[in-house]
């Protein structure tokens, strides 16, 4: 009888794995192309989306602190917020920014980005990274111009890119 109990246990574990495997493995939760811009935190932690598929067209579901919004990937042009028919808040482009006095309202005016030379690369060099580095293991940028202020787009220690304070 112990062998039957092991069979039942193994069957139960396999069934549990199948039930709790993320849908992305089946292709129904495919991530949209592009990289989310670096967004400043939304103060009221509203999650306007959970997955890229919650956003229309080529918009991605991007983290903004404890909240999330649908955002045009890699955009730095001034954008605007709009609501979809399903009530999803969409950020057309730019960086979502709030201030403690704004009561959760979101500004989408981009930061001033000064380009050094004609290629958009900012001054300074990327710092060396100690492996493994703790933090977000996801792409936050693809080029310096997507980072605010004098921050540069550099490797973050897990094979991804993030906005980092450069060395001068």
UniProtKB/Swiss-Prot annotation:
Signal peptide extent: 1-30
Limits of the WAP domain: 31-74, 119-167
Keyword Ligase: no
Disulfide bonds: 36-62, 45-66, 49-61, 55-70, 126-154, 137-158, 141-153, 147-163
GO CC annotations on file: extracellular space
Main location, first listed in the record: secreted
Positions of the UniProt region annotated as Disordered: 100-123
Entries under Pfam families matching the protein: WAP (PF00095)
Cell compartment(s), UniProt: Secreted
Coiled coil: none
Gene Ontology BP annotations: antibacterial humoral response; innate immune response
Keywords from the named record: Aspartic protease inhibitor, Disulfide bond, Protease inhibitor, Repeat, Secreted, Serine protease inhibitor, Signal, Thiol protease inhibitor
Subunit structure: Homotrimer; disulfide-linked.
PANTHER family: WAP FOUR-DISULFIDE CORE DOMAIN PROTEIN 2, WHEY ACDIC PROTEIN WAP
Entry protein name: WAP four-disulfide core domain protein 2
The organism of origin for this protein: Rattus norvegicus (Rat)
Gene: Wfdc2
């Amino acid at each position: 009888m112990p062998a039957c109990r092991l069979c039942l246990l193994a069957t139960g574990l396999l069934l549990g794995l199948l039930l709790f495997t993320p849908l992305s493995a089946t292709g129904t939760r495919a991530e949209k192309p592009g990289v989310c811009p670096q967004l400043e935190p939304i103060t009221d932690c509203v999650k306007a989306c959970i997955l890229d598929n919650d956003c229309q067209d080529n918009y991605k579901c991007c983290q903004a602190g404890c909240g999330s919004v649908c955002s045009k990937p890699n955009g730095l042009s001034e954008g605007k917020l709009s609501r979809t028919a399903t009530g999803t808040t969409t950020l057309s482009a730019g960086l979502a920014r709030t201030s403690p006095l704004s009561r959760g309202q979101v500004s989408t005016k981009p930061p001033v980005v000064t380009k050094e030379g004609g290629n958009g690369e900012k001054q300074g060099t990327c710092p060396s990274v100690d492996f493994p580095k703790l933090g977000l293991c996801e792409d936050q940028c693809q080029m310096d111009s997507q980072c605010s202020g004098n921050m540069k787009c550099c490797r973050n220690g897990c094979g991804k890119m993030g906005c980092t304070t450069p060395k001068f």
